[in-house]
Protein backbone atom coordinates (compact mmCIF):
# COMPACT_ATOMS: atom_id res chain seq x y z
CA UNK A 1 0.00 0.00 0.00
CA UNK A 2 1.05 3.62 -0.52
CA UNK A 3 3.42 5.57 1.71
CA UNK A 4 1.87 7.09 4.81
CA UNK A 5 4.76 9.52 5.50
CA UNK A 6 2.86 12.38 3.93
CA UNK A 7 -0.67 12.64 2.58
CA UNK A 8 -1.11 11.62 -1.04
CA UNK A 9 -3.47 13.97 -2.85
CA UNK A 10 -5.57 12.92 -5.81
CA UNK A 11 -5.87 15.93 -8.12
CA UNK A 12 -9.18 16.98 -9.69
CA UNK A 13 -8.15 16.07 -13.25
CA UNK A 14 -11.55 16.69 -14.86
CA UNK A 15 -12.11 20.14 -13.36
CA UNK A 16 -12.26 22.73 -16.11
CA UNK A 17 -13.29 20.21 -18.77
CA UNK A 18 -15.94 17.75 -17.59
CA UNK A 19 -17.22 20.27 -15.07
CA UNK A 20 -16.58 23.89 -14.15
CA UNK A 21 -13.19 24.49 -12.53
CA UNK A 22 -13.93 27.93 -11.06
CA UNK A 23 -15.28 27.41 -7.52
CA UNK A 24 -17.79 30.27 -7.53
CA UNK A 25 -19.27 29.35 -10.92
CA UNK A 26 -19.37 25.64 -10.03
CA UNK A 27 -21.13 26.41 -6.76
CA UNK A 28 -23.71 28.53 -8.60
CA UNK A 29 -24.37 25.72 -11.08
CA UNK A 30 -24.83 23.13 -8.34
CA UNK A 31 -27.11 25.47 -6.40
CA UNK A 32 -29.28 26.05 -9.47
CA UNK A 33 -29.58 22.35 -10.30
CA UNK A 34 -30.44 21.43 -6.71
CA UNK A 35 -33.05 24.20 -6.49
CA UNK A 36 -34.62 23.05 -9.76
CA UNK A 37 -34.77 19.48 -8.44
CA UNK A 38 -36.81 20.66 -5.46
CA UNK A 39 -36.96 19.41 -1.86
CA UNK A 40 -36.24 15.80 -0.82
CA UNK A 41 -39.06 13.44 -1.78
CA UNK A 42 -38.28 10.22 0.03
CA UNK A 43 -36.51 10.93 3.32
CA UNK A 44 -32.76 10.64 4.06
CA UNK A 45 -30.95 8.44 1.54
CA UNK A 46 -29.00 5.34 2.51
CA UNK A 47 -27.66 5.20 -1.04
CA UNK A 48 -28.10 7.05 -4.31
CA UNK A 49 -27.44 6.22 -7.94
CA UNK A 50 -26.04 9.21 -9.79
CA UNK A 51 -24.63 9.69 -13.33
CA UNK A 52 -21.03 10.63 -14.06
CA UNK A 53 -20.99 12.33 -17.47
CA UNK A 54 -19.96 15.92 -18.04
CA UNK A 55 -22.11 18.20 -15.91
CA UNK A 56 -23.57 19.98 -18.94
CA UNK A 57 -25.15 16.65 -19.87
CA UNK A 58 -26.12 15.15 -16.51
CA UNK A 59 -25.77 17.77 -13.78
CA UNK A 60 -29.48 18.53 -13.63
CA UNK A 61 -30.30 14.81 -13.39
CA UNK A 62 -27.69 14.11 -10.71
CA UNK A 63 -29.20 16.86 -8.54
CA UNK A 64 -32.34 14.74 -8.09
CA UNK A 65 -30.21 12.13 -6.34
CA UNK A 66 -28.11 14.53 -4.29
CA UNK A 67 -31.08 16.45 -2.94
CA UNK A 68 -31.91 13.26 -0.99
CA UNK A 69 -28.67 13.30 1.02
CA UNK A 70 -28.95 14.41 4.64
CA UNK A 71 -25.95 16.15 6.25
CA UNK A 72 -26.30 13.93 9.34
CA UNK A 73 -24.15 11.18 7.80
CA UNK A 74 -20.46 11.24 8.66
CA UNK A 75 -19.08 8.82 6.06
CA UNK A 76 -19.85 8.47 2.36
CA UNK A 77 -18.86 5.38 0.39
CA UNK A 78 -18.42 6.02 -3.35
CA UNK A 79 -18.56 3.03 -5.72
CA UNK A 80 -17.57 3.77 -9.29
CA UNK A 81 -16.84 1.56 -12.30
CA UNK A 82 -13.50 1.32 -14.04
CA UNK A 83 -13.60 2.62 -17.62
CA UNK A 84 -9.89 2.43 -18.45
CA UNK A 85 -8.30 -0.39 -16.44
CA UNK A 86 -9.54 -3.95 -16.25
CA UNK A 87 -9.99 -5.03 -12.63
CA UNK A 88 -10.96 -8.46 -11.38
CA UNK A 89 -11.99 -7.12 -8.00
CA UNK A 90 -12.41 -3.85 -6.13
CA UNK A 91 -9.56 -1.34 -5.81
CA UNK A 92 -8.98 1.36 -3.22
CA UNK A 93 -7.12 4.63 -3.65
CA UNK A 94 -3.54 5.22 -2.45
CA UNK A 95 -4.57 8.79 -1.65
CA UNK A 96 -5.58 10.27 1.68
CA UNK A 97 -7.12 13.41 0.20
CA UNK A 98 -9.32 13.99 -2.84
CA UNK A 99 -9.08 17.48 -4.31
CA UNK A 100 -12.14 19.35 -5.61
CA UNK A 101 -12.61 22.99 -6.66
CA UNK A 102 -14.97 23.39 -3.68
CA UNK A 103 -12.57 22.03 -1.07
CA UNK A 104 -10.74 18.83 -0.28
CA UNK A 105 -12.28 15.58 0.95
CA UNK A 106 -10.56 13.22 3.39
CA UNK A 107 -10.52 9.46 2.86
CA UNK A 108 -11.29 7.28 5.87
CA UNK A 109 -8.17 5.15 5.87
CA UNK A 110 -9.28 3.31 9.01
CA UNK A 111 -12.14 1.85 6.97
CA UNK A 112 -9.69 1.16 4.15
CA UNK A 113 -7.57 -0.87 6.59
CA UNK A 114 -10.66 -2.86 7.62
CA UNK A 115 -11.39 -3.60 3.97
CA UNK A 116 -7.79 -4.57 3.20
CA UNK A 117 -7.95 -7.01 6.13
CA UNK A 118 -10.60 -9.04 4.26
CA UNK A 119 -8.04 -9.84 1.51
CA UNK A 120 -10.71 -8.91 -1.04
CA UNK A 121 -9.46 -5.42 -1.89
CA UNK A 122 -6.39 -4.21 -3.77
CA UNK A 123 -4.77 -0.81 -4.08
CA UNK A 124 -4.84 1.00 -7.41
CA UNK A 125 -2.09 3.35 -8.54
CA UNK A 126 -2.55 7.10 -8.23
CA UNK A 127 -2.42 7.35 -12.03
CA UNK A 128 -5.24 4.82 -12.37
CA UNK A 129 -7.25 6.76 -9.81
CA UNK A 130 -6.72 10.11 -11.50
CA UNK A 131 -7.43 8.78 -14.99
CA UNK A 132 -10.85 7.47 -13.94
CA UNK A 133 -13.75 9.95 -13.93
CA UNK A 134 -16.60 7.94 -12.39
CA UNK A 135 -15.70 8.79 -8.79
CA UNK A 136 -14.39 12.31 -9.38
CA UNK A 137 -17.63 13.47 -11.01
CA UNK A 138 -19.48 12.75 -7.74
CA UNK A 139 -17.17 14.79 -5.52
CA UNK A 140 -18.35 18.40 -6.11
CA UNK A 141 -21.96 17.29 -5.61
CA UNK A 142 -20.95 15.58 -2.35
CA UNK A 143 -19.25 18.74 -1.08
CA UNK A 144 -22.31 20.80 -1.98
CA UNK A 145 -24.81 18.33 -0.51
CA UNK A 146 -22.85 18.15 2.74
CA UNK A 147 -22.24 21.90 3.03
CA UNK A 148 -24.77 22.26 5.86
CA UNK A 149 -22.92 19.76 8.02
CA UNK A 150 -20.85 21.44 10.74
CA UNK A 151 -18.92 18.33 11.82
CA UNK A 152 -16.17 16.66 9.74
CA UNK A 153 -17.05 13.78 7.45
CA UNK A 154 -14.99 11.37 5.37
CA UNK A 155 -15.30 9.45 2.13
CA UNK A 156 -14.52 5.83 1.20
CA UNK A 157 -14.00 5.71 -2.59
CA UNK A 158 -13.60 2.39 -4.37
CA UNK A 159 -13.32 1.32 -8.00
CA UNK A 160 -15.37 -1.76 -8.88
CA UNK A 161 -14.04 -3.95 -11.66
CA UNK A 162 -15.77 -6.29 -14.11
CA UNK A 163 -16.65 -8.97 -11.59
CA UNK A 164 -18.95 -11.96 -11.81
CA UNK A 165 -22.20 -12.19 -9.81
CA UNK A 166 -20.59 -14.46 -7.20
CA UNK A 167 -18.02 -11.76 -6.46
CA UNK A 168 -20.67 -9.05 -6.50
CA UNK A 169 -22.49 -11.02 -3.81
CA UNK A 170 -19.28 -11.46 -1.81
CA UNK A 171 -18.44 -7.76 -1.88
CA UNK A 172 -22.04 -6.92 -1.04
CA UNK A 173 -21.83 -9.10 2.05
CA UNK A 174 -18.63 -7.34 3.17
CA UNK A 175 -20.12 -3.88 2.65
CA UNK A 176 -23.53 -4.70 4.15
CA UNK A 177 -22.55 -3.77 7.70
CA UNK A 178 -21.37 -0.36 6.49
CA UNK A 179 -24.61 0.22 4.60
CA UNK A 180 -26.60 -0.66 7.73
CA UNK A 181 -24.65 1.85 9.86
CA UNK A 182 -26.79 5.02 10.26
CA UNK A 183 -23.63 7.12 10.07
CA UNK A 184 -22.94 5.95 6.52
CA UNK A 185 -24.44 6.36 3.07
CA UNK A 186 -23.41 5.13 -0.38
CA UNK A 187 -23.05 6.89 -3.73
CA UNK A 188 -23.28 4.53 -6.71
CA UNK A 189 -21.83 6.12 -9.84
CA UNK A 190 -23.44 4.98 -13.07
CA UNK A 191 -24.79 6.14 -16.38
CA UNK A 192 -27.40 3.99 -18.08
CA UNK A 193 -27.76 2.94 -21.73
CA UNK A 194 -24.92 3.91 -24.08
CA UNK A 195 -26.66 3.55 -27.43
CA UNK A 196 -25.18 3.80 -30.91
CA UNK A 197 -22.61 2.36 -33.27
CA UNK A 198 -19.75 4.00 -31.36
CA UNK A 199 -20.82 2.06 -28.26
CA UNK A 200 -21.30 -1.17 -30.22
CA UNK A 201 -24.87 -1.37 -28.92
CA UNK A 202 -27.97 -0.69 -31.00
CA UNK A 203 -30.78 -2.69 -29.44
CA UNK A 204 -34.05 -1.48 -30.95
CA UNK A 205 -37.51 -2.94 -30.39
CA UNK A 206 -39.67 -1.25 -33.04
CA UNK A 207 -42.92 -2.15 -31.28
CA UNK A 208 -41.83 0.18 -28.45
CA UNK A 209 -41.89 3.25 -30.72
CA UNK A 210 -39.06 5.40 -31.99
CA UNK A 211 -35.47 4.58 -31.09
CA UNK A 212 -35.32 6.95 -28.12
CA UNK A 213 -38.59 5.50 -26.83
CA UNK A 214 -37.19 1.99 -27.14
CA UNK A 215 -34.10 3.09 -25.21
CA UNK A 216 -36.25 4.62 -22.48
CA UNK A 217 -38.34 1.49 -22.12
CA UNK A 218 -35.17 -0.62 -22.06
CA UNK A 219 -33.73 1.55 -19.29
CA UNK A 220 -36.94 1.48 -17.28
CA UNK A 221 -37.03 -2.30 -17.44
CA UNK A 222 -33.56 -2.12 -15.93
CA UNK A 223 -34.76 0.26 -13.23
CA UNK A 224 -37.56 -2.12 -12.33
CA UNK A 225 -35.11 -5.00 -12.04
CA UNK A 226 -33.02 -2.85 -9.67
CA UNK A 227 -36.13 -2.02 -7.64
CA UNK A 228 -36.55 -5.73 -6.93
CA UNK A 229 -33.33 -5.46 -4.88
CA UNK A 230 -32.51 -9.02 -5.87
CA UNK A 231 -29.15 -9.66 -7.51
CA UNK A 232 -30.56 -12.46 -9.68
CA UNK A 233 -33.22 -10.12 -11.08
CA UNK A 234 -30.69 -7.50 -12.19
CA UNK A 235 -28.27 -10.10 -13.56
CA UNK A 236 -31.09 -11.74 -15.54
CA UNK A 237 -32.08 -8.38 -17.03
CA UNK A 238 -28.51 -7.70 -18.12
CA UNK A 239 -28.21 -11.15 -19.68
CA UNK A 240 -31.47 -10.72 -21.59
CA UNK A 241 -30.90 -7.23 -22.98
CA UNK A 242 -27.17 -6.58 -22.65
CA UNK A 243 -27.89 -2.97 -21.70
CA UNK A 244 -24.66 -0.97 -21.57
CA UNK A 245 -25.08 0.31 -18.00
CA UNK A 246 -21.47 1.21 -17.22
CA UNK A 247 -21.98 1.09 -13.45
CA UNK A 248 -23.71 -2.27 -13.49
CA UNK A 249 -21.12 -3.83 -11.17
CA UNK A 250 -21.28 -1.09 -8.49
CA UNK A 251 -25.09 -1.25 -8.72
CA UNK A 252 -24.98 -5.03 -8.35
CA UNK A 253 -22.73 -4.78 -5.27
CA UNK A 254 -25.21 -2.37 -3.67
CA UNK A 255 -28.11 -4.69 -4.49
CA UNK A 256 -26.18 -7.62 -3.01
CA UNK A 257 -25.54 -5.67 0.21
CA UNK A 258 -29.23 -4.82 0.54
CA UNK A 259 -30.27 -8.38 -0.25
CA UNK A 260 -27.93 -9.68 2.44
CA UNK A 261 -29.32 -7.25 5.03
CA UNK A 262 -32.89 -8.16 4.12
CA UNK A 263 -32.09 -11.88 4.37
CA UNK A 264 -30.64 -11.36 7.84
CA UNK A 265 -33.84 -9.62 8.93
CA UNK A 266 -35.96 -12.76 8.69
CA UNK A 267 -38.64 -11.73 11.21
CA UNK A 268 -39.58 -8.46 9.48
CA UNK A 269 -40.57 -7.17 6.09
CA UNK A 270 -38.01 -5.92 3.60
CA UNK A 271 -35.96 -3.11 5.11
CA UNK A 272 -35.11 -1.12 2.01
CA UNK A 273 -36.80 0.40 -1.00
CA UNK A 274 -35.38 2.27 -3.97
CA UNK A 275 -37.10 4.98 -6.02
CA UNK A 276 -36.02 6.47 -9.34
CA UNK A 277 -36.51 10.22 -9.24
CA UNK A 278 -35.31 11.42 -12.64
CA UNK A 279 -34.44 10.11 -16.09
CA UNK A 280 -32.81 11.84 -19.05
CA UNK A 281 -31.09 11.13 -22.36
CA UNK A 282 -28.22 13.14 -23.84
CA UNK A 283 -30.11 13.23 -27.15
CA UNK A 284 -33.20 11.68 -28.73
CA UNK A 285 -32.12 9.04 -31.21
CA UNK A 286 -34.29 8.98 -34.32
CA UNK A 287 -31.98 7.08 -36.69
CA UNK A 288 -29.63 4.13 -36.43
CA UNK A 289 -26.64 6.43 -36.99
CA UNK A 290 -27.53 8.53 -33.93
CA UNK A 291 -26.14 7.96 -30.44
CA UNK A 292 -27.06 8.83 -26.88
CA UNK A 293 -26.29 8.15 -23.23
CA UNK A 294 -29.02 7.78 -20.61
CA UNK A 295 -28.90 9.12 -17.05
CA UNK A 296 -30.99 8.40 -14.00
CA UNK A 297 -31.12 9.47 -10.36
CA UNK A 298 -32.27 7.07 -7.67
CA UNK A 299 -32.50 6.99 -3.89
CA UNK A 300 -32.40 3.95 -1.60
CA UNK A 301 -34.10 4.33 1.76
CA UNK A 302 -34.52 2.41 4.95
CA UNK A 303 -38.30 2.02 4.95
CA UNK A 304 -38.73 2.93 8.60
CA UNK A 305 -36.94 6.24 7.98
CA UNK A 306 -38.70 7.09 4.71
CA UNK A 307 -41.18 9.93 4.44
CA UNK A 308 -44.76 8.79 4.09
CA UNK A 309 -46.58 9.90 0.97
CA UNK A 310 -46.83 9.24 -2.76
CA UNK A 311 -43.58 9.31 -4.69
CA UNK A 312 -43.40 9.89 -8.43
CA UNK A 313 -41.16 7.03 -9.56
CA UNK A 314 -39.98 7.54 -13.15
CA UNK A 315 -39.41 3.78 -13.51
CA UNK A 316 -43.18 3.32 -13.38
CA UNK A 317 -44.03 6.02 -15.94
Can you describe what each PLM-predicted range is?
Residues 4-256, 260-270, 279-282, 286, ...:
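Active-site histidine-anchored catalytic micro-motif
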Residues 271-305:
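Caspase-like cysteine protease fold
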